[in-house]
Every structure is written in C-alpha cells, then in structure tokens.
Amino acid sequence: MRGIAKSIVLILLILAGTLAYFLYPPEPRAVTFPGGKRFAFSIVDDTDMATLERVKPLYELLHRYGFRTTKTVWVLESNEPSHPPNRGDTLQDPAYRAFILDLKKRGFEIALHGVRGGSSQRQDIIDGLKEFNGILGEYPKIHINHSLNRDNVYWGELRWSFAPFQWGYGLIGKHKFFGQDSASAHFWGDLVKQHVRYVNQFTYGDINLLTINPSMPYRLSDKPYVNYWFPTADGDNLDWFDELLRPENLDRLEREGGVCLVYTHMGAGSFNKDGGPHPRFEARLKDLASRNGWFAPASEILDYLREQPGWTPDLSFREEVRLEILFLWNAILRGLLPAPIHS
C-alpha cells in the first residue's frame, strides 16, 4: 500500500509541476495607446438572434457614449431556422441593411459570423462574401465561427492544438466542422486566408487580455488558413458583461494598461428592458466612457498591436498549451458556477 501511495504522490507531483510549467505567466507586454489613452476597449457582438428592434437602441447608446465597436452580421437568410441561435435579421432585410450601413458610416466595424445562421456550401459562401463586399464596400476583416455551422474553420476538435485536448474533444464532441477541409463541400479556408485578417479562437474570464496573451494577435502553424487569431473576454450576456466590467475590474484594466475585447450577444435579449437598453448596460458604458480609454473597433486595436515593439506573432508550444488550459478552465468555471446575481 505504501508503494502505491508513493506512486500516486509522485504522479500528482509530476502533474502539478507540468501544470505549473505551462501556466507560468509569460513576460508582460507594455503597450502605449494613441492619444495618451490608458487602455483599449471594444465589443465583439455576436449576431445570434439579433433583430433591428433589439439592437438599434443599444447601438444608439454606444454611439452616444463615444464607442466604436465591432458587430457581426449574416448576409443570407438562415437555412436551418429550427436551431434558435440561427435566427435573426440579415442583410437581406432592407431596414436592417440600412441600419448596418449607418453603423459603418458612424465608425463601427461590420464583421462576419459566417454568411448565414446555418451551414453553407462553398458557392453560397462565395456569393455571400461577394454580397458583403458589394454592400459594405470591403470584405470583413474579422470572422467569428457560428454555433454548429459545418463551414466553421478549425472548430470542434480542430479548435485545439494540444494533442490530448484535441483527442479528448474528438471523443466527446458530437459535431464535425469542415471549413478548413479542401475535400469538403463546406470548404472556404482559402477565402478566409485571402479576405479575412482575424478570427476569434478562445474566450476568457479575465478583463485584461494582455495578461492572457501578451503577443495577441497570434498565428498557429497547424491552422494555416487563418492569418491571425485573437482572444476575447467573456461577456456572453448582460450578467456576465456586468460582472466583467465592474468598477474594480475597470480600475485594474486602466492601471495595467490593458486590452479588453468583450465577446457578447447584444441581440439575444438580455441587454434590453422595456423596449430600450437595460439600465445596467448603460451604467457600465457610462463608467467606461468616463475613463481615459481608447474605444475603437476590434480590428483597429489588433492592427495597432501588431505594429508595436515587442510583438511576436508565432506562439511557442508552451504559450499554445497555456492558452488552451486557461480556456478550458474558464469553460469549466462557467459551467459549474451560477451566473452572477444582480439587483
């Protein structure tokens, strides 16, 4: 029994040492922002379930407080509307299209969430990208994979680079994704490489993404169709958004000279109340706007970070594993902990 106990202790010590090695924080990166600003902030708004009625008041509020953020859109109508996250307005709707064009005119960034809510084959993707370009005058700089779309690039088990995580997800994951598979009817990896600059990979619970990934944005050698990946901070719904941007976190973001790109679903309903923006949403924006922050679209911030001294886009193996462990840990916490409770 003593021999077994010693073996268990030894294994635990080895595991602890290995975990400590991968989780040891990388060298911090100091960044100076335009105009003497103390930190950078944006929102990356996922278009799931977004309707003109819900999102227009929210963006009016963002504009009023001086924010320029990133909003994803769908070009084509959903072909799988029975899946709730696939529902929402698209650029096929004239009023919604006019609203999106007005946002772009005001300085907001329009990004892609796949060409539709639902899986698309290559010709539809080509047509959707051309229509995006025709309407907005440019191709999207940012793409965000959507839910169960089979045309997602490097999604599911291929979202991971560390082999044990990839294998583990492959065993439990029920869905496959083919956007990077040149033999698939859903392939468009070459178009991502040609037209899209940034793709979101993982989301974290930390407000300052530079502490998670100092070299953001980054490249991954095993995912060649994506030019650059970037992390986001978890503000999925109003409760998590409110929790992430509480005053003490904003104090820290400002103190550390950090970067926060909040990933959220502004059109899903939680940000609205009585036909307008929820008061808690406005309170967080008001606090943010009172601080010396650089409020710019996500791709503008990422472009700027690439130009700063000390940027190293190619992650080491250790950094890759660290990002994946931290993402897994955040996902576990989100699953185990109750949502924040607010009055």
Give names to the regions the model predicted.
Residues 2-11, 17-223, 241-262, 271-343:
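Catalytic alpha-helical scaffold of carbohydrate-active enzymes acting on polysaccharides/glycoconjugates
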Residues 225-238, 266-273:
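Surface-exposed cleft-lining segments at the edges of enzyme active sites
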